[in-house]
């Protein structure tokens, strides 16, 4: 008898499939089941396959009928392989609060990037935080640095106010600080931010069974089960696993690009390549046919800035091996792949990097499409944000098309098309918004306050009568007067007008937070 033959495998649902089976060796054991009836034999076989109450994952057994055996003969594969399932209790997440936020200025002039409002009532920090909770990960560190007051306030109200059950988990905000004897300076990169608080993490790990560190960014829009990423990390016995996404030609140079072999091991990493270096990072993405339409449009694989490290590997890289390097993407990862098992996890669902005013604006406008590419609402994986206890929005004789209207708004005889209206927004008679994002207000003004302001020739919070706005981002608490036109009709791409209350970035007008646009202004 030959040492290898093909036989019919009996999976749990009873359908046969072809599988190679080795007859000798410790990998399998041939068992005879006596002269039982066919029904009793099948039931016994299936019970053996199921491993009793524990299931096949616990026993590692698989039943097959060999081609030369009688129906009563059963071959049971008792494999030595047992899948090591990833445990979310062994994962700690580190969310990076970002740098100075120059790419999103002026939205970041008084707030950290993760605190920027998105989608009407959320903040960017809600994305990784909610993904963590929905993945079962409840040990979270948020590292903050610049303009962190509003971010800290939002985290406290949303995640530290008792609304979410952490059981044995926690959310800790780690603000940039300086240790005695340490050179002055802010975080010098993503890796340096983690390194500065390595002592906090080490102390935490002594009391918790943390095996894997998940590094996340606070400026992206996506929905992910992080435990699928961690599971691949465990299955591959990887030192580092990068979450990657296919990207097109137009934006490829904005990201760190990767190449990996047939086993998923990363063999090349190039941070924001240009010219010939960019061309060299092209890959055949036809293997993504099952997940995306026309993968040829996405000839690059980009790192999402989402990483999983083995705990000891991360500590060694930051403290010893690359103690002088400051950034994961541009410095540590390109070096680490040569002597560490660095694996790629390809993410094919919606993902948008909110790195510029243009990408931020486009991502918000895409939420208004029908059907949208991304939905905040999902009953199984909801996104959390600060509870505000606001009344429902009131509208009177309004025309609304493809719009997101947040709670607590007052809309009167206005027209809204393909726009997002944030909490506590007020739009008055004759006003029109098209392709606009209005972030709303932190508080209400009473009718008496509004009347007093108008009698004094001042502008109340909101959009005044007969004002027309398009292709615009209106930051919080903005006061826009009557008969204003904001459309950038001349097509200016870049402009700084802080004394007039606005900037222009990539052709998009951005009204500053707390700005006042006087009656009759044309932008």
Swiss-Prot record:
InterPro entries: ADP-Glc_PPase, ADP_Glu_pyroP_CS, NTP_transferase_dom, Nucleotide-diphossugar_trans, Trimer_LpxA-like_sf
Primary localization class, coarse: plastid
Top-rank taxon, per record: Eukaryota
Enzyme Commission (EC) number: 2.7.7.27
Top EC category: transferase
Activity regulation, free text: Highly active without 3'phosphoglycerate, and is only slightly affected by the activator 3'phosphoglycerate and inhibitor orthophosphate.
Gene Ontology MF terms in the entry: ATP binding; glucose-1-phosphate adenylyltransferase activity
One GO cellular component term: amyloplast
Role noted for this protein: This protein plays a role in synthesis of starch. It catalyzes the synthesis of the activated glycosyl donor, ADP-glucose from Glc-1-P and ATP.
Name of the protein: Glucose-1-phosphate adenylyltransferase large subunit 1, chloroplastic/amyloplastic
Species of provenance: Hordeum vulgare
């Amino acid at each position: 008898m030959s040492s290898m033959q093909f036989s019919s495998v009996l999976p749990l649902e009873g359908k046969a499939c072809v599988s190679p089976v080795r007859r000798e060796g410790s990998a399998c054991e041939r068992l005879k089941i006596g002269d039982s009836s066919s029904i009793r034999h099948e039931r016994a076989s299936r019970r053996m396959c199921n491993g009793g109450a524990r299931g096949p994952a616990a026993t590692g057994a698989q039943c097959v009928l060999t081609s030369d055996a009688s129906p009563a003969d059963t071959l049971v594969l008792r494999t030595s392989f047992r899948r090591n399932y990833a445990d979310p209790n062994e994962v700690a997440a580190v969310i990076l609060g970002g740098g100075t936020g120059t790419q999103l200025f002026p939205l970041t002039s008084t707030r950290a990037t993760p605190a920027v409002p998105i989608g009407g009532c959320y903040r960017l920090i809600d994305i990784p935080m909610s993904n963590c909770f929905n993945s079962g990960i409840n040990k979270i560190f948020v590292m903050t640095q610049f303009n962190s007051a509003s971010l800290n306030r939002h985290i406290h109200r949303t995640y530290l106010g008792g609304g979410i059950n952490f059981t044995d988990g926690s959310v800790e905000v780690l603000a940039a600080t300086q240790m005695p004897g340490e050179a002055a300076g802010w975080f010098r990169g993503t890796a340096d931010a983690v390194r500065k608080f390595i002592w906090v993490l080490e102390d935490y790990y002594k009391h918790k069974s943390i095996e894997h560190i998940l590094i996340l960014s606070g400026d992206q829009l996506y929905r992910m089960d992080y435990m699928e990423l961690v599971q691949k990390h465990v299955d591959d016995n990887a030192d580092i696993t990068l979450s990657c996404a296919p990207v097109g030609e137009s934006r490829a140079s904005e990201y760190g690009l990767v190449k990996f072999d047939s086993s998923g091991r990363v063999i090349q990493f190039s941070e924001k390549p240009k010219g010939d270096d960019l061309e060299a990072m092209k890959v055949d993405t036809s293997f993504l046919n099952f997940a995306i339409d026309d993968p040829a449009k996405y000839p690059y694989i980009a790192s999402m800035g989402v990483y999983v490290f083995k705990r000891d590997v991360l500590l060694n890289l930051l403290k010893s091996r690359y103690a002088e390097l400051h950034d994961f993407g541009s410095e540590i990862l390109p070096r680490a792949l040569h002597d560490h098992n660095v694996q790629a996890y390809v993410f094919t669902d919606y993902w948008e990097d909110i790195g510029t005013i243009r990408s931020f604006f486009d991502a918000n406008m895409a939420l208004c499409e029908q059907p949208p590419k991304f939905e905040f609402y999902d009953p199984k994986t909801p996104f959390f944000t600060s509870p505000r206890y606001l009344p429902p929005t009131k509208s009177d004789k309004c025309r609304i098309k493809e719009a997101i209207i947040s709670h607590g708004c007052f809309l009167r005889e206005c027209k809204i098309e393909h726009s997002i209206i944030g909490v506590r927004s007020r739009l008055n008679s004759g006003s029109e918004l098209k392709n606009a994002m209005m972030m709303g207000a932190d508080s209400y003004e009473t009718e008496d306050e509004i009347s007093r302001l108008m009698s004094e020739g001042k502008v109340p919070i909101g959009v005044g009568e007969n004002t027309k706005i398009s292709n615009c981002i209106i930051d919080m608490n903005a006061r826009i007067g009557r008969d204003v036109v904001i459309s950038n009709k001349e097509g200016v791409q870049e402009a700084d007008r802080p004394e007039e209350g606005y900037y222009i970035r990539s052709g998009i007008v951005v009204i500053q937070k707390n700005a006042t646009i006087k009656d009759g202004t044309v932008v």
